[in-house]
């Protein structure tokens, strides 16, 4: 009888706890409610804009959003302390890690940049490009912005190989 009472008491406590526990919820950021904003010109060459930016609250560290680059626009060199993932959604662009070749990226491509790697990305000279950028903050640091990508570097011949 005692084990049955103990089991019943545990079930009752669990049921009551579920009634008083805060409900888990999701946040939905509706496309129609989000603003398109120009990117910071101190970190980009040319015209680009950000849409649908999001940033998780601590303890989560994820942030991201859509970035649309007009033809010829690009980021400056930069480093993400915990890496960055780009999902190209439209058009064609270019990316490069320091010391590596310039590579073409197209709609459907995914670029995974490891933590601490100096790189840049942007549209091709004659074609727009849009991607979703996803990263993580490290102790309140998202990105270390560096120098502008020169035209000499940006206009290098494209290496036609896989992203890896």
Segments and roles (model prediction):
Residues 75-77, 95-96, 119-124:
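Short beta-strand His + acidic residue motifs that chelate non-heme Fe in jelly-roll/DSBH
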Residues 9-18:
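Bacterial N-terminal signal peptides
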Residues 66-70, 79-95, 134-136:
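Short, conserved beta-strand element in jelly-roll/cupin
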Residues 22-61, 142-164:
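A short, N-terminal "cap"/entry segment at the start of jelly-roll beta-barrel domains
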Residues 99-116:
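Short acidic-glycine-tyrosine-enriched beta hairpin
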Residues 126-145:
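A short hydrophobic beta-strand segment most commonly corresponding to one strand
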Residues 1-10:
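Bacterial N-terminal signal peptides that target proteins for export
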């Amino acid at each position: 009888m005692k084990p049955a009472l103990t089991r019943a008491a545990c079930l009752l406590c669990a049921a009551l706890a579920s009634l008083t526990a805060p409900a888990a919820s999701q946040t939905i950021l509706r496309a129609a409610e989000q603003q398109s904003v120009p990117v910071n010109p101190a970190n980009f060459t040319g015209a680009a804009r950000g849409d649908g930016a999001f940033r998780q609250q601590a303890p989560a560290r994820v942030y991201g959003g859509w970035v649309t680059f007009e033809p010829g626009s690009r980021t400056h060199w930069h480093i993400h302390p915990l890496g960055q993932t780009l999902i190209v959604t439209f058009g064609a662009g270019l990316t490069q890690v320091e010391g590596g070749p310039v590579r073409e990226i197209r709609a459907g491509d995914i670029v995974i940049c490891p933590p601490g790697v100096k790189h840049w990305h942007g549209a091709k000279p004659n074609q727009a490009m849009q991607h979703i950028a996803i990263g993580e903050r490290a102790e309140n640091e998202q990105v270390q912005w560096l120098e502008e990508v020169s035209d000499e570097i940006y206009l290098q011949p494209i290496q036609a190989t896989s992203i890896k």
